[in-house]
UniProtKB/Swiss-Prot annotation:
A GO-annotated cellular component: periplasmic space
Subcellular location: Periplasm
UniProtKB keywords: Cell cycle, Cell division, Periplasm, Signal
Gene assigned in the entry: tolB
Domain of life: Bacteria
Protein name: Tol-Pal system protein TolB
InterPro entries documented for this protein: 6-blade_b-propeller_TolB-like, PD40, Tol-Pal_TolB, TolB_N
Keyword Cell cycle: yes
Function description: Part of the Tol-Pal system, which plays a role in outer membrane invagination during cell division and is important for maintaining outer membrane integrity.
């Protein structure tokens, strides 16, 4: 799990020519790029060693499956059926017969090799432009064997970046609230998993209600809201050590905690004397600063990536809308003016958009708008859905959605969903239990 155990060793072969392949991710992709992901070749001795350590029959094939599934889930790529491949993995990795790959309509090809070296996992991979008959990229990784799924995610990130021109989002994690039990008596725990739903781990026991977990910029810490003895408090949790602490001792109710981009502060909403305003706390000296001072309800603050601006929602106009202000609370400006109520605004890591939840005529929408309020687009609608969180490249949103219950209160569920920025590729994210309040980490490796 620790990042220091995975290293990119070297670039084997530099890119010598511009490839013909180009994937446009700014529009809904109705024609995903056909890509062949060949099983990574592996010698018999390495196969036996990994089988003993990891209980995996063929680690080369397993890593290629991770890459294939990631590419398919992105909606931008169409991994081809391996049964149609005409060339063996070990041969394809050395020198592909491009005419064979052209026959099955592949435009890009991923090949590679897995070996067991000095008790470590070594993975080499290559990306080929089939149409141009050229190698586009070649990299090698060495890590502990248990990190094999992460290697698959990192390979996907490299392929995604080379073919789209933008960073990927596959070597990431999602923290969320796991939910079990009847709707009126839910057991809620903090849980964390890889972005594809694997390696799920519970971080709390479910003895207290937990809400709104959010990652720190380093991905090591999480801030969240928990009810202890029926009092809501903001907590910090170290994911690696399991240590947690209360962030201050506020006499009122605290809500919606989130880290500043530099990780030095937590911004939150604090209710006192019937009024809710936005505050920050310096995590080093624990000094609390009041950012808004208004008789309305101000909540759900989120920083811009450079830390200079804050977006939040407030009912100061009479009903719930989205506002933007300087990080010191000055120059408050309303930016949402459409019909309905707006909430849970969150700034894109790219800095260009704000995602939000909207309630209008009994339906909930997940949408985006520019930071000045123009260009509002509603991406998806449902009976109930909220709490969008951005992928680190700002191209995908994850949120949660609830189902209706029948007259007996049966049939309730809460699930995580994702959708890309164009409004396409909407899909459910698999979790072990019901799930809500997702937060997407930044990339674990660059």
């Amino acid at each position: 799990m620790l990042l220091r155990y995975l290293f990119i060793l070297f670039i084997i072969i530099p890119i010598k020519a511009f490839a013909l392949i180009e994937v446009d991710i700014t529009r809904g992709n109705l024609n995903p790029l056909p890509v062949a992901v060949s099983p990574l070749s592996i010698d018999n001795k390495s196969k036996e060693n990994f089988k003993k350590i990891l209980k995996q029959e063929d680690l080369g094939s397993e890593i290629s499956i991770v890459v294939e599934n990631n590419l398919r889930q992105s909606g931008l790529f169409n991994p081809l059926d391996k049964n149609a491949f005409l060339q063996e993995p070990d041969v394809a990795n050395l020198k592909p017969r491009f005419e064979d790959w052209n026959l099955i309509k592949a435009q890009a090809l991923v090949t590679g090799k897995v070996t067991f070296v000095d008790e470590k996992l070594r993975v080499e991979f290559r990306l080929w432009d089939v149409l141009a008959g050229k190698e586009m990229m070649a990299l090698a990784f060495t890590t502990v064997p248990s990190n094999w799924r992460r290697v698959g995610h990192i390979i996907t990130d490299k392929v995604y970046e080379r073919l789209t021109g933008e960073k990927g989002y596959f070597d990431t994690r999602i923290i969320y609230v796991s939910e079990e039990g009847p709707k009126t008596k839910r057991i809620k725990k903090l849980a964390i998993m890889d972005q594809d739903g694997f390696n799920n781990k519970y971080l709390t026991l479910g003895n207290e209600l937990v809400l709104t977990p959010r990652f720190s910029p380093t991905n090591q810490m999480v801030t969240y809201l928990s009810y202890f003895r029926n009092l809501p408090r903001v907590y910090l949790l170290d994911i690696e050590t399991g240590m947690q602490e209360v962030v201050g001792d506020f006499p009122g109710m605290t809500f919606a905690p989130r880290f500043s981009p530099d990780g030095k502060k937590i911004i939150m909403s604090f209710a006192k004397d019937g009024n809710s305003d936005i505050y920050t706390m310096d995590l080093e000296n624990r000094i609390v600063e009041r950012i808004t001072n208004h008789p309305s309800i101000d909540t759900s603050p989120s920083y811009s990536p450079d830390g200079k601006k804050i977006t939040f929602n407030s009912d100061r106009s009479g009903y719930q809308q989205i506002y933007v202000m300087d990080s010191n609370g000055k120059n408050v400006k309303r930016i949402s003016f459409g019909n309905g109520l707006y909430g849970t605004p969150v700034w894109s890591p790219r800095g260009d958009l704000i995602a939000f939840t909207k309630l209008h005529k009994g339906k909930f929408y997940i949408g985006v708008m520019r930071t000045d309020g123009t260009g509002e687009r509603l991406l998806t609608e449902n009976f109930y859905q909220e709490a969008p969180s951005w992928s680190p490249n700002g191209r995908v949103l994850i949120f949660y959605r609830e189902t209706k219950t029948n007259s007996k209160g049966e049939g309730f569920s809460a699930k995580l969903w994702s959708i890309d920025l164009t409004g396409y590729n909407e899909k459910m994210v698999e979790t072990e239990t019901d799930a809500s309040d997702p937060s997407w980490s930044s990339l674990l490796s660059n």
